[in-house]
Amino acid sequence: MKVYNFDKVISRDGTYSAKYNNKGHDIIPLSVADMDIPVADFIVSELSVANQKGIYGYTLLSDDWQQVAAQWYQRHYSWKVNPEHIVFCPRVVQAVSLFIQNFTQPGDAIVSLTPAYHPISHAVEVNHRVLLESALLYRDHHYEIDFADLEDKFKMACCFILISPHNPTGTIWSEDNLRKIAVSYTHLTLPTNSLV
């Protein structure tokens, strides 16, 4: 297995980096999704091959992308997913918006844990749904779900947006937390499928 140097500093100057454009200010960017380590060599190599063609037009998904995604879920989670049920969406916020538009109605209440990644909270509101925020508890240097508050919010909601790792806290919800949510709050449902 290749050893990677995670201490190597790579300048982001001239790359239009969203998190470093304000570097003249006294701030430390702590993004969750924008890491400061290089991607794996094999990815750089494959992109270099594609770059040699010199054409940067629109592309289509490969014919087997759904099958590859289904195999990944099976391999990593022992979850057998019908490849035809996998839908491509280029960004998480758009995927959340599409879900909201297709599985809830204007005026419906949707629960989210806070603090929250603002673009996802905004997706609830811009789609004319009511955002119910359940504040996380900060205890002993980590965040916890306030299950009493969450249960109260669930009584008024038809949908729950769960993000793990949570953004912006970086919290990865434990299996116990996920089971408690799934078992306790199964009334948040689609016609035959639980949303939690």
Model-derived features with residue positions:
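Short, solvent-exposed loop/turn segments at secondary-structure junctions
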Residues: 33-37, 117, 166-168, 194
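Hydrophobic pocket-lining residues within nucleotide cofactor-binding pockets
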Residues: 35, 136, 190
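Conserved small/polar residues in nucleotide/adenosyl-binding loops
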Residues: 186-192
